[in-house]
Structures are given as C-alpha cells and as structure tokens.
C-alpha cells in the first residue's frame, strides 16, 4: 500500500521528482527557468551584446523611391520603383482582356489566365517552372480582367535575371499543348459551376451589371468563358488572339524592389528581338472600339432557398444591383467619383472582418441601420480607360424586393443633394487611409505602377493622389452625381424576381425628385 501511495505522489509531482521520495510541506518553492548569465539583467530598451545590429528603413527622405520609365526600341515599356527589402515583385502587364474579344470566341482571356505558367520553350512543365522559382523563394500568379492581363512573380531580388527570363518565356513562348488545353477546359468548366453555386453572388452580379450597361460591346462582353465556347477554343484560336494583342507596344514590364538599370538590362536581354511562339510579332487586326454605355436590365431567375455553406441554411435572398455611368480613370472627375463611392460605403448586415468599418457611411446610416430586413447594401465603382460604372448592390427577402429597390433609388437621388462637410471629410480621410495602407504592400505597388504606366505611360505618386483627394469639394461631388443621374440606369437582378419593379419604373424613379417608384394598382391580390 505504501508503494502505491508513493507512486501516486510521484506522478502528481511530475517526472522531475522521481529521484526524491520525501514529501515537502509549507510554501511552494519557485523554480528559476533562466539559465543564468547576463541577458536577464539587460533592459528591453538596450540591445543584446554580440547580436548583429539590424538595418532599418530610413525616413529622412534622402532616398526618394520614384517611378522610373524607359521605353525600348520595340515599344515595350519598363517601369520600376525601388523599395526597401530583399524581395521584389516583377511582372508583365498586357493591354488585353475580355473587352477585346468582339472578333473572337468569348472566353479566350479566361483560358489564357488558366494556361499561364504552363510548359514553354525552355520549361517542360509547370512543375519545372515552380521548381525554378522556389530556388529564389518565388511564387507566381496570373490574373485577367476586362482590360488587362497580368503575369507576376515575387522572389528574391538576387534572382531578377532568372525571373525576367522566365516571365518572357511564359508570355512569349508558351507551348499550349493539347493536353494543357484539355485540362484548362475542365478547369474553366469547374469554375463556371462554382460561380453559379457559390453563396456570394457578387462576381456573377458584376458580370450581369456590365452585360446590362454595355450591351455586347467592349467591357460588356463576357468576362468568363460561356459554356458553349469551352469545347471550341483550341490552340489555333488562342494563337490568333495572341498574335494581335501580345505585342511589345501593348506590354509593360514592371518591377518593385529592383534597380531600374538592372531591370532594363534584363528586358533588353529577354524581351527585345524575341520571336514569339505564334510567329509574327506585329499585330494584324486590333479592336480599338470605345465603350458605348447603353443601360438596360439583365435578369436571372434562380431558386436561392437551398443555398448554404454547411448544415445551417442561408436565408433566401434576392440580389439587385443598380448602376449608372460615371467616368473613366483618365478624367478629372475620377477622384470626386472615388470620394462619392467611399461616402456611400455600405456593407453587409454582418462582417467577420471586425466591426466599425464604414459604419458612418450613407448606406449604413440610411439603409442598413433603418431597415433591419436588408442583408446587404454596398457601393462599387468600376472604372476603365473610356468609361466607368458606379453601382449599389442590395439584397433582401424576395417579398420585399420592391421596397428594397425604392430605397436604393432614393439613395441615388440623395447623392445629388446636400453634402455634409463632416461626412465629406470622413470619406476623404477614409479614401486616403485606404490608398496609403494598400500601398504598403509590395504586390499592390507593383500593380499600381504597371496599370498606370500601361494606361498613361506615367505614374501619379501617392502624395499627388492624396492632394487631389484633399481638394475635392462638396460641389464637386454634387456636380458629378447630378451628371450621373441624367443617364439611363443599368440593372442586374438575381433570385426570385416575382416582385421586381419593371425597368421603366426604376428609370422613372431615378428621374424623379424623391426616387419613389410609380404606384402600381392591382385588381386582385
């Protein structure tokens, strides 16, 4: 019995007490976990002895990280901005996308995005490309939008030569084998199915609002490949498109965290005088169409009652997006529109990203706070080189669709009304804060540099944009809103649309003084 008690006591005291059989009583003895030495006696405000001195970025302004741009003999632009750190982000941005597919099968840009970083003339497979990048701690990505295709790599700056050579090979020398194209067909098919089944309808609504606003032209063409075109797109079709739009004069090699001269040398080495895989380096037939805003409505009836992420069902909702033409990002009114969009703000009835963001924006104060049955009210601003679209997305129970649409049309009318000085300053401060916070990220700086140089051949620095934001006055916001309201609306509707007002009624509400929908009379209910 004594042996059992002794064993139990040892277990309670831990493995360190197996060498001692005598129980201790009284105050507990505290053990020092420090190994001794001088370090525990050094205050946190003093550096540890023998440790290399860290190198920090300076803020004295002696080194100005300005964007430098060089144009090569073939028309390709090289843009760079140095940045503190040992890693860089480098990529090729191309003036191509779904808006240029009017003379081609819709969906080519979608295919090219999924085929990116596959086998090339130098690399036999995607695995070989990834292995090469891993030697420099690198990752790669390709994204396409309606007007831009972007191939990007983030890696150690010491591997810049390898990275630029790899990017040149991926963009100009893709093999596009039958096996890769077939695999891409399955990937695109899966993505389309996922797009139609996901609970978040925002990507689909964005596609629909562009379709309604720009009927079958430029940015109104399908961003995603239509199902009927999946089997039709092959290597010959892709080469026909690449021959016209993957030309040096439509490209920008952008880099952040690199020396400009080194990047230019790499561009001359790998992107000058290179024969692309499709043969000719000169474009034959380029679509230079200007976006034509038409307005209209795009509707899609769908049963949203069974949409769920898990065992807990999501409430059945009808989603509406109403938009009006704004302006291109090349116009002076782009900044007032950006401030107006931030002033409208909005969001969902629940945000997992932390409470408080935008809670004093108009769509929160006037819509979500006053109408508990609305699940979402968010403002979006899409801007391109020749047009723009400011829209509001709202969602609610299908039985309250008419009331929801009227609330949104009223908010559009109020945009051209009185602008409170406090809310304007808050919106400008939020916009400036968001701009500067996003530009702390190296990949975001890369995209900003590349897109601006691609569109304007130069770049406005952040402090210039902040000055433009600060100079926006209440009358500027009122002016651009009044101008916007003179156009025809674009409407996208998804879900149970039984009680959806007609397009003519929505247009009438946006032309009125109070934003109210015309009254409807029913003989039978």
Swiss-Prot record:
Keywords: Acetylation, Membrane, Mitochondrion, Mitochondrion inner membrane, Transit peptide. Its main location: mitochondrion. PANTHER family: METALLOPROTEASE, MITOCHONDRIAL-PROCESSING PEPTIDASE SUBUNIT ALPHA. Substrate recognition and binding subunit of the essential mitochondrial processing protease (MPP), which cleaves the mitochondrial sequence off newly imported precursors proteins. It comes from Pongo abelii. Belongs to the peptidase M16 family. Heterodimer of PMPCA (alpha) and PMPCB (beta) subunits, forming the mitochondrial processing protease (MPP) in which PMPCA is involved in substrate recognition and binding and PMPCB is the catalytic subunit. It is found in: Mitochondrion matrix; Mitochondrion inner membrane. GO terms for cellular component: mitochondrial inner membrane; mitochondrial matrix. GO terms for molecular function: metal ion binding; metalloendopeptidase activity. It comes from the Eukaryota. The gene is PMPCA. One of its GO terms (biological process) is protein processing involved in protein targeting to mitochondrion. The modification N6-acetyllysine is found at residue 299. This is Mitochondrial-processing peptidase subunit alpha. InterPro entries: Metalloenz_LuxS/M16, MPP/UQCRC_Complex, Pept_M16_N, Pept_M16_Zn_BS, Peptidase_M16_C. PROSITE patterns: INSULINASE. Residues 1-33 form a transit peptide. The modification N6-succinyllysine is found at residue 64.
């Amino acid at each position: 019995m004594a042996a059992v008690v002794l064993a139990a006591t040892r277990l309670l005291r831990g493995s360190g007490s197996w060498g001692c059989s005598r129980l201790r009583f009284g105050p507990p003895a505290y053990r020092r976990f420090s190994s001794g030495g001088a370090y525990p006696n050094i205050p946190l405000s003093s550096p540890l002895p023998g440790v290399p001195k860290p190198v920090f970025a300076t803020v004295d302004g002696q080194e100005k990280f300005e964007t430098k741009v060089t144009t090569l003999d073939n028309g390709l632009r090289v843009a760079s901005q140095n940045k503190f750190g040992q890693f860089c982000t480098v990529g090729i941005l191309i003036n191509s996308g779904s808006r240029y597919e009017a003379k081609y099968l819709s969906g080519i840009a979608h295919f090219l995005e999924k085929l990116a970083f596959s086998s090339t003339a130098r690399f036999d497979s995607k695995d070989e490309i990834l292995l090469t990048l891993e030697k420099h701690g690198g990752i790669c990505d390709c994204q396409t939008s309606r007007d831009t295709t972007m191939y990007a790599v983030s890696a150690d700056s010491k591997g810049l030569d390898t990275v630029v050579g790899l990017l040149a090979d991926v963009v100009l020398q893709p093999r596009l084998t039958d096996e890769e194209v077939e695999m891409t067909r399955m990937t695109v098919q899966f993505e389309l199915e996922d797009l139609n089944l996901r609970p978040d309808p925002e990507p689909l609504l964005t596609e629909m609002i562009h379709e309604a606003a720009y009927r079958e032209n430029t940015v109104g063409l399908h961003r995603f490949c239509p199902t009927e075109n999946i089997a039709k797109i092959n290597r010959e079709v892709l080469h026909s498109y690449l021959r016209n739009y993957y030309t040096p004069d439509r490209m920008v090699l952008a880099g952040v965290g690199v020396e400009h001269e080194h990047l230019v040398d790499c561009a001359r080495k790998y992107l000058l005088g290179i024969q692309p895989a499709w043969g000719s380096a000169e474009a034959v037939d380029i679509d230079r169409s200007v976006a034509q805003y038409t307005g209209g409505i795009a509707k899609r009836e769908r049963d949203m009652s069974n949409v769920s992420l898990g065992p807990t069902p999501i409430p059945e909702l009808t989603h509406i997006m109403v938009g009006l033409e704004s302006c291109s990002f090349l116009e002076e009114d782009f900044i007032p529109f950006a401030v107006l969009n931030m002033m409208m703000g909005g969001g969902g009835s629940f945000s997992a990203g932390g409470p408080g963001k935008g809670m004093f924006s108009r769509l929160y104060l006037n819509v979500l706070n006053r109408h508990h049955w609305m699940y979402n009210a968010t403002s979006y601003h899409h801007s391109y080189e020749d047009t723009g679209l400011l829209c509001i997305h709202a969602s609610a129970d299908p039985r309250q669709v008419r009331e929801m649409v009227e609330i949104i049309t009223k908010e559009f009318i109020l945009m051209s009304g009185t602008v409170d000085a406090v809310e304007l300053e808050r919106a400008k401060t939020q916009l400036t804060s968001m701009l500067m916070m996003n530009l702390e990220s190296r990949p975001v700086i890369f995209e900003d540099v590349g897109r601006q140089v691609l569109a304007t051949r130069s770049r406005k620095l952040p402090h210039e944009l902040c000055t433009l934001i600060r100079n926006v006055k209440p009358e500027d916001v009122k002016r651009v809103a009044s101008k916007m309201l003179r156009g025809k609306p674009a409407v996208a509707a998804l879900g149970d649309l039984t009680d959806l007002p007609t397009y003519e009624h929505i247009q009438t509400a946006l032309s009125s003084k109070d934003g109210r929908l015309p009254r409807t009379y029913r003989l039978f209910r």
